[in-house]
Amino acid sequence: MKYFLLLFLLVLSFTLVESVYQYQILILEPIYRFTDSAAVPAKSIYFTNLPQHFSLTQKSSKLDLSQFNVVRGFTQEMFLKNLGCGTDTCQNFPATVTSVYNIIDLKGRLKFETNPAGTDNVLGKAGYLATEEIEGLVRYDEYYSEEDDSFTYTNGKYPNQFGACQLRDYGKLRYKFVRTLGHAFTAVAIPENLPIYSIFAYDDGLPEPTTTVSPTLSPTQYVFETNPIWKILKNSKNGTQGVGAVNLPWTPPVSASPIEPTNVCLLNGNSSVLSRYGEIDRMLQFFDDTHVIIGFKDSIQDASNTFIYSYIGYAFKSSDNLCGIPLKPIRELYKAGVGNTVVAGDDYSDLISSGYMLTGNIIGYTIDCNSTTDGELIVMIPDGISTISSTTILLTSQFATSSPSQIVGYYVQPVKIVGPSASGGEQGYWVDPELPEPQIGDVLGISNVCLFTASSSIISKCGYTRNIYVYYDNVDKFYFVSLYTFGRSVTSKVIGIAFETEENSCGLNLVPIRELYKDRYYVVAGNDYQYLIDDGYNITGNIVGYTVDCKDSKDEFVYGHLPSYAFSTTTSSMTTTASDSTTSDSSVIVSSSKNPAVSNPFITTYSLPSSPNNPFISITTTPDSASSQKISTTTAISHSAYSASPSTIPTTTPYDLTKPLPKLDCNIIENYGDLNGRMVNFANVMEVGDNITITGHIWQNASESTFNLYVGMDPKYLQSYISIHINMRWATDGIVYNYFWGMWNYQFESYSTRPFSRGLPYVLSVVRGINYYDVYGNGQFIKKFGIIGSVALHQVGAMYGYQQWNIDTVKMNCARSHTTTVEPSTPLETASTSQSTPSATLTSTTENIPSTSKIPETSTTQRPTSPILTSGATSTSSSTESTTTSPTTSTTTTLPPTTTPYNLSAPIPKLDCNTIQFYGNLLWRPVVFSRYMEVGDNITLTGFIWNNATESNVNFYLGFNPLFGTTAVPVHISQRWSSSARIIYNNFWGQWGPEAFSARPFTRGQPFVISLIKTANSHQIYGNGQLLINFGYRGTASQNLIGSMIAYRESTIDTVSMACVRPPTTPTTTTSTTTTTTPKLTTTSTLPSTSTAIATTDVSTRPRSCDINSITLGEGDANTPQLQLDAVLGESSGSSLSIYCRGLPNYSIYMMFNVNQGGPPPVIDGYLEITLDCLPDSEGVWTFGGREITAISCFQAPKCSTFVPSFWRSVDLPILSPTSRVVMLLTWQ
């Protein structure tokens, strides 16, 4: 949920005054775009009411509306819906609005109009726009094309002025800015079958007392004003009571009056200072049909007919704070017929005696009003907590290369405006760090626009960035600066890097790059452009990008936070106590005394060197390592009496984002971070039989994910021709295919099914045929796309993936070898590694290239629980560790990789000192260990954090039967992305304990590695290779016997690994899946064949002969309490399958087999589990006690009576003995 806030600060005699924010829900009217797909180029019109368009079947003399036959959906900008609106007011919006109409003008052109003329044909009111610029609203501009004689509408915030599809539709049209109609709204939620709405926050103009810094206080003391929460009588039909602020500055929709104050006092003051004490948030006041309540903004997320009324103060989200503030829980109480009230702390006996009951809801934490003095709270900041914002720290351009830094400098240079040279010519722009002065003319001046000129791969981690060009229009003979060509015939030169929007994650103060015009001269400026207006320039209305103002730079650097990098995971062996690694040389190199559970000697450290002589930021690694001749390591353990045998502690190596991408030359590009939005150029054009494969993750909130194969070498995005365009539109079920040859031809759009899912990994492959492409998704053939036009012209030389997915690797498998020298495709050296592991594994890859083969065949065998080893050959030893690095790269030819989908139907095996992977997203799936964690054991999770994550959690449970919300949790790890930059740790033993905190090294939209290591009296948690916290035991050692885990909320879990100090006592059981993908090509070209074996363990199991999907499981009903329960699949070991059902603790649980057949004896403890057998002679049928089982249903009843459905008449219970059979007559009680 997005809130737009207007800050209004008054500083008067040491008093900071912060205004009250009013929150209001606004219902919006979406604007739909309709396109005439037959027009070349495509034309579009805009309507705000979808049925209205279809009702206009009549043909105007100037305009045939029926020809606009393609609905492009609604735009990002929306009008205020016409609900209770007047001349200049609508929905109580606190600013002046103006009406907007759909009209057809005298020339027969459809457009929006705020003041229709008498000659205009008014079709209907479209909605309302705000008349003034307010933060949170977007400018709504009108553009006109002379070529097309039509109007189009968009906002002035985006540099290309149109969305991607609109820009393609209008690629050959030149639209000129006409006017700004007003300011439009954007939606924060688009629910199904509900109104589209936005939440708007505005300053009410009334001062609210906040932090007062008295001259008598020390610099570390702050005063916060407090205000009590009042009981409020809501004057509705039943006159129920609520709670909220006593001073209501605005009249609510239903009037209310105060009764008396509670002892709950909220804080008001400088939130940036207050947030240094602990996790705080705004407390809001809500109202519904009958009540007035308080809570944080997320407390009504799923409530209906509940509205935000006003902001009333700050409260803490937990009882922990760093300054000793006596926080009390804000408890909610309720009395039937009266309503709600609240109390701070445990003193509520008088309310209980008067008929109130605790609801169990803890709204937040604040102080008791009795803790204040004259309504003020004085807080002293302890040593070590800075009260100065990091943005006020004086930064210099000198960075120490030996120490890591969170603040980095980004190299920028100003755009210089260049006039005609003496020999004639046109005015242009110049920025080039390699040349001291421009060579094309005289410098007229230096603009206040500074562009980034460092590596785009680094600055792109701050937000959406692209190369910005100076273009020369070959037709109209003028220069202009932009991120895109707007379909013009141009020549271009890259002059820097700019952002597409003003949003960034590095704390950079971005300003719009505004375009101004005078006498065929186009110039750019930031927010300060008055001097150009005075010189006769006019604003064109175009914003061509976002960058920094030169006044914010210092010595050609601007400073911001280091963006979070993608990480690749490597493992290094834990140091063993008194262990030796020996080679032929017997000399001792190093002796170390490091606790493996505390510090990892092999963790890579990073430094960020930067100097004026080398302005480009680079990442270097400084491994703590020595020669590998002989290493004698002695481990001194100060607090735990155990010896760590070889295991794995994850380390994290950042992708080298400073290197430009190499050309893809029949190899793989990986370890360069997210390749989304980066053009991957090929060393040679694609040939028949070549296969391009990409892998990665699809965002959980993705709306579109797109893949293009471009024609030509070194193509340009939105300019060059596209041979095949693959577009996944997640609002629909399929994939759209097309091509782009100067324009989109929607008549050639085709479709296929989509095997991918949001939030999960994917594998997408495209194989080139003679006159077609074969497309594979997750191992399935999904589309044969015929090449359109002359095949000889489709010389594909690059690929480009963009929009809402991550691209981790791009690989090309070629049908024939190329003679070119292959450069290393990754910045990491190819290594052959020998290391100590619990069990030996040998992996080899053999390529057989026959003389003739017409079909590229690839066969891959995967073992889901065995790790993939990327080295060419791996051997193991019980006491050695050595690494040999080969700096050379040889040219090899491989064939298309298999695209094996994850086996999402296979039950998850027990984690037995191994790795669970290839089971899709393990989120919400219980992972049960084969034994309790022992001292020195390490559990490691790898995965990906969603881009829109609000919370990502992991629970490590007591025992082997994790019940979410019930089973004890010795270690709970919570990342709350929307409210804190910390990680929260806790335990659950019937109730939550006190919270602990650490820094958070993870970032939304990036991969992560998190590990938990057990010691004698604590659990140590590592994140991306860093020790985050030493979390001491809560309770006894027996209360910290971790045997299972569940990860939940917004993340993707790819692997869960367990590294054990003691080898497993039972052979490792591996569940295997085998998939063979054969792309069929109707070509006579000679293609090689490759057989690849992926690393497997040496123990395999007999394939299961019974299908787990053959059992029909009953579902629970909606009664309270339930009578019928869910029957749930449990574990499967191949020859057995567990089924369980769970009910209330004091109820009896019954199971029914097949159709009205008795099941096992009932149980009284609320949990019933059985095991079905799949015997060798059962012919693929699950059995229980020799009986064939096809369906199972579960029921519960109070144990004190026989409570079963009336349709049960007589029930056969299972055979209890060979000679006895029990029959019970059950009736409705």
UniProtKB/Swiss-Prot annotation:
Glycans are attached at residues 238, 270, 370, 538, 691, 701, 903, 938, 948, 1146. Residues 1-19 form the signal peptide. Keywords: Glycoprotein, Lectin, Repeat, Signal. Coiled coil: none annotated. Residues 678-813, 925-1059 form the Galectin domain. InterPro entries: C6_domain, ConA-like_dom_sf, Galectin-like, Galectin_CRD. Residues 818-903, 1061-1087 are annotated as: Disordered. GO terms for molecular function: carbohydrate binding. Residues 830-846, 870-901, 1067-1087 have a biased composition (Low complexity). PROSITE patterns: GALECTIN. It comes from the Eukaryota. Pfam families: Gal-bind_lectin. SMART domains: C6, Gal-bind_lectin, GLECT. Residues 818-829, 847-869 have a biased composition (Polar residues). This is Putative uncharacterized protein F40H6.5. It comes from Caenorhabditis elegans.
